[in-house]
């Protein structure tokens, strides 16, 4: 039991005294956050621009909805309901 305690104490002391500690100083954390974005090019479409990605997603959804709407209204098999000359689309 005493050997286990000494071993755990030695490991804890080693972890806190060496640079193996996972806790970063504020300066190191800011430097890491600053440098992380520079290792890949900042071109449109990259996840660095989440708003642009979201807008592309919304445009794709809108395009798909428009295609489905036109597919429904131009379907020749539902004539009286889908004929734009007879019925105004709601």
UniProtKB/Swiss-Prot annotation:
Residues 1-20 form the signal peptide. The keyword Transferase does not apply. The keyword Signal applies. One of its GO terms (cellular component) is extracellular region. It is found in: Secreted. Keywords: Secreted, Signal. InterPro entries: DUF4543. It holds the Pfam family DUF4543. Disulfide bonds: none annotated. This is Uncharacterized protein C17orf67 homolog. It comes from Mus musculus (Mouse).
